[in-house]
Amino acid sequence: MSKVSNGGGDSKNTLYCSFCGKSQHEVRKLIAGPTVFICDECVELCMDIIREENKSSMVKSREGVPTPQEIMAVLDDYVIGQKDAKRVLSVAVHNHYKRLAHQSKNSDIELAKSNILLVGPTGCGKTYLAQTLARIIDVPFIMADATTLTEAGYVGEDVENIILKLLQAADYNVERAQRGIVYIDEVDKISRKSDNPSITRDVSGEGVQQALLKIMEGTVASVPPQGGRKHPQQEFLQVDTTNILFICGGAFAGLDRIISARGEKTSIGFGATVKSVDERRIGEVFKELEPEDLLKFGLIPEFVGRLPVIATLEDLDVDALVQILTEPKNALVKQYQRLFDMENVELVFHDDALRAIANKAVERKTGARGLRSIMEKILLDTMFELPTLEGVREVVISGDVVDGSARPLYIYAERQDEKGNVSAGMA
């Protein structure tokens, strides 16, 4: 029968966790089995691993298709806010699975795919949503950067490289690759330089849009086997892109002004109340997005037509950024606490510190993407000193530390009884 130890006892009989090596005095519970021991922290870690595997396998419906609610539930664990965008993605991925599941069945109605465009300011979670989808879906998934693409025949990657990467993600299984999902990031960077047709060749803008049209709509792409270079005598793998779902994302800097200008034209009169762009958050403006605004931005009509589903993301306020710091399963605060835990030190953030970090990210207009760099700067000196310091039990980060007017507070194990309460009060 296994026994549970709550700590205590003399040092000669000290027991240690067989997995992490911590002693019974460093953990809350130590469970004993035949010749092995496991602490409560390792039990929790094992439970997290099991939960992760359950989530990634995902509960399937009777048709073998994950429901939108199931997909969104997993996205909610990792991505804070952006409810509308998550609903759009969940439905689109569900429909993608459903189309593939029913494709072999005889029907007079052919189900067309609906590619997606994600529009949102920098650091609002577009790329992270796609990365999270990659972990939870059961089809090959790749991310491509639109800024590296050029027309075929010019220096740079041509669009068929996207299909090659998808094929590699499917271990060169053509059938699996043809059921995959492609996320194209920074798609706003391939807009043409003006909304008038150009008389000069635009190989990285309009030219790339033209090249993407065929693979997004559905064509048979010739891909060199095992990623080799193309040459005339070579055998090619034929990949049909008809059933590949394309998700495009971009920040579209300046699009908010185009939308607002259109709104001002339609809101003229004594009773009209028009807020300037500065008075409204970018996410609010993006909610009024129409396809004609994308045309003015520089996307060609055919390209916009290939993206019938448009999901807009909101810019993140201070409260949302604080949630991002603490609530997701792999939240930044949890990541740094784990790093400090490896030194047997507890890292504590006061609420005012979290809000100060979020405020800095808002001021810099970097969104969630800027949180890590702010955290790194705050904790750099501490992470440099900590491995050589002895007896540090706890590091406390307050709002003053984030503002630069104070240093992190170190609480030493041997001073806990004498000065522990005083130190905590100072923080």
Curated annotation (Swiss-Prot):
GO aspect biological process, one term: cell division
Binding sites annotated in the UniProt record for Zn(2+): 17, 20, 39, 42
GO CC field: HslUV protease complex
Claim: Nucleotide-binding is one of the keywords in the record: yes
Gene Ontology terms for molecular function: ATP binding; ATP hydrolysis activity; ATP-dependent protein folding chaperone; protein dimerization activity; unfolded protein binding; zinc ion binding
Alphabetical keyword list: ATP-binding, Chaperone, Metal-binding, Nucleotide-binding, Zinc
Quaternary assembly: Component of the ClpX-ClpP complex. Forms a hexameric ring that, in the presence of ATP, binds to fourteen ClpP subunits assembled into a disk-like structure with a central cavity, resembling the structure of eukaryotic proteasomes.
Name of the protein this chain belongs to: ATP-dependent Clp protease ATP-binding subunit ClpX
Organism, as annotated: Brucella ovis (strain ATCC 25840 / 63/290 / NCTC 10512)
Taxonomic placement: Bacteria, Pseudomonadati, Pseudomonadota, Alphaproteobacteria, Hyphomicrobiales
